C-alpha cells in the first residue's frame, strides 16, 4: 500500500490538490509515531500555498446567552442549565474592544451574537456598532449572527461586513447528534447566500464531540466542497450544564493530526486556531499547530471561555518568525 504521506506530498504539496475524504481518513488514522512527519508536511503545504503570514483576529459577544437553539456544546443555549445568562454589550464597549483588538496587530474583528438568527433590534445594534467602529478603528469587520434570510444577507453586505462566520460545526451525518432545533442544510443555505452577496465565507466547526474519524474526514470533505475563505477549528471544551459537559477532552495527538489533515484537505484555505486549543493542546501544542498547518489565530478570550493571553500568541509568532498579516483593505 502506498504511504499516504508520500501521496500527499505529490498531490497536495506539489500540485496543490487537496486530499479527498478517503485519503483524509488515512491521515487521521496514522499512528502517533508518524505525527512529526505529518505536521512537517502540513507546514510545508501551508507555506507553499498560503505563505508565511498569519492572520490575527479578535472576537466579541454583542449578545450573550439566551439562545433558543439546542447546540449541545454551547453554554449560551437558554435550554440548558448552564451558568451563562443573557446580556447585551453597549456600543462604547464594542468600540473599545475593537480598539484593543487592533492594538494586537489584528486585521479582523468579529461581532458575534447568540441567536438563531438576527431580529430587527440586533441588526440595528450591529449597524450602529459597525458605524461607530469605522469612525474610530482601522480594522475589518466580520459578523456571526446565526442563520440569515436573503434580505438580512444583503443588509449586512451593505453595512460593509467583510466576512461572515457560520459554522457547520460537524459532518453532515453527525449533525443531528449535536443540534436538533435546526438542520445542517439551513446552515449550508445561509453560507451560499453569504458567498453570493460577495462577503467572504468563514465556516468551520468543533472537533471532539463524539464524532468518529470517518465523520471527521467527512467534515473535511464537506468543507472542501463549500470552499470557504476561512476554516476556524475549535476543540470541545466541555461546558458544565450542557449535554456535552461530561465528554472527555480530545487527546492532543489526535487534535494535531486533525489540524494537519484539514490542511492537507484544504491546502489554500485560511485555517484558524479557535476555541478549546488551550486545554486540548497547551502551549507546546499551540506551537506544533502553527508549525503543522495553522495560519490564523483568534487572540484573547472567546465568547464564554478564556483564551491564551494575546501577548503569548504574538510572542509565539515572533519567536517562530511568522509575520502577522497586514491590513490591506480600504475601509
Swiss-Prot record:
The keyword ATP-binding does not apply. It holds the Pfam family BATS. Pathway: Cofactor biosynthesis; biotin biosynthesis; biotin from 7,8-diaminononanoate: step 2/2. One of its GO terms (biological process) is biotin biosynthetic process. Its cofactor is [4Fe-4S] cluster; [2Fe-2S] cluster. SMART domains: BATS, Elp3. GO terms for molecular function: 2 iron, 2 sulfur cluster binding; 4 iron, 4 sulfur cluster binding; biotin synthase activity; iron ion binding. The keyword S-adenosyl-L-methionine applies. It catalyses: (4R,5S)-dethiobiotin + (sulfur carrier)-SH + 2 reduced [2Fe-2S]-[ferredoxin] + 2 S-adenosyl-L-methionine = (sulfur carrier)-H + biotin + 2 5'-deoxyadenosine + 2 L-methionine + 2 oxidized [2Fe-2S]-[ferredoxin]. Gene3D superfamilies: Aldolase class I. Residues 52-277 form the Radical SAM core domain. [4Fe-4S] cluster binds at residues 67, 71, 74. Its EC number is 2.8.1.6. Belongs to the radical SAM superfamily. Biotin synthase family. HAMAP family: BioB. Catalyzes the conversion of dethiobiotin (DTB) to biotin by the insertion of a sulfur atom into dethiobiotin via a radical-based mechanism. This is Biotin synthase. The lineage of its organism: Bacteria, Bacillati, Actinomycetota, Actinomycetes, Mycobacteriales.
Amino acid at each position: 500500500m502506498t504511504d499516504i504521506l508520500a501521496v500527499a506530498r505529490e498531490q497536495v504539496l506539489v500540485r496543490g490538490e487537496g486530499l479527498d475524504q478517503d485519503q483524509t481518513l488515512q491521515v487521521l488514522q496514522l499512528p502517533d509515531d508518524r505525527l512529526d512527519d505529518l505536521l512537517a508536511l502540513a507546514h510545508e503545504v501551508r507555506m507553499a500555498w498560503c505563505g508565511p503570514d498569519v492572520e490575527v483576529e479578535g472576537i466579541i459577544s454583542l449578545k450573550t446567552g439566551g439562545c433558543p437553539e439546542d447546540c449541545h456544546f454551547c453554554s449560551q443555549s437558554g435550554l440548558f442549565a448552564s451558568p451563562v445568562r443573557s446580556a447585551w454589550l453597549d456600543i462604547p464597549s464594542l468600540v473599545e474592544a475593537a480598539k484593543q483588538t487592533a492594538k494586537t496587530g489584528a486585521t479582523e474583528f468579529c461581532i458575534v451574537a447568540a441567536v438563531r438568527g438576527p431580529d430587527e433590534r440586533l441588526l440595528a445594534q450591529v449597524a450602529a456598532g459597525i458605524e461607530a467602529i469605522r469612525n474610530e478603528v482601522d480594522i475589518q469587520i466580520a459578523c456571526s449572527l446565526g442563520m440569515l434570510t436573503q434580505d438580512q444577507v444583503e443588509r449586512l453586505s451593505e453595512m460593509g461586513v467583510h466576512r461572515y462566520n457560520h459554522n457547520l460545526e460537524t459532518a453532515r451525518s453527525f449533525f443531528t447528534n449535536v443540534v436538533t432545533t435546526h438542520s445542517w442544510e439551513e446552515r449550508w443555505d445561509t453560507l451560499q447566500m453569504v458567498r453570493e452577496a460577495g462577503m467572504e465565507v468563514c465556516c468551520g466547526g468543533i472537533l471532539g464531540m463524539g464524532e468518529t474519524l470517518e465523520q471527521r474526514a467527512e467534515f473535511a470533505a464537506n468543507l472542501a466542497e463549500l470552499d470557504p475563505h476561512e476554516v476556524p477549528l475549535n476543540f470541545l471544551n466541555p461546558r458544565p450544564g450542557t449535554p456535552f459537559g461530561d465528554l472527555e477532552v480530545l487527546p492532543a495527538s489526535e487534535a494535531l493530526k486533525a489540524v494537519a489533515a484539514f490542511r492537507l484537505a484544504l491546502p489554500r484555505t485560511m485555517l484558524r486556531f479557535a476555541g478549546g486549543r488551550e486545554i486540548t493542546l497547551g502551549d507546546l501544542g499551540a506551537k506544533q499547530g502553527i508549525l503543522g498547518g495553522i495560519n490564523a489565530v483568534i487572540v484573547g478570550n472567546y465568547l464564554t471561555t478564556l483564551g491564551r493571553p494575546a501577548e503569548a500568541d504574538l510572542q509565539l509568532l515572533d519567536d517562530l518568525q511568522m509575520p502577522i498579516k497586514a491590513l490591506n483593505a480600504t475601509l
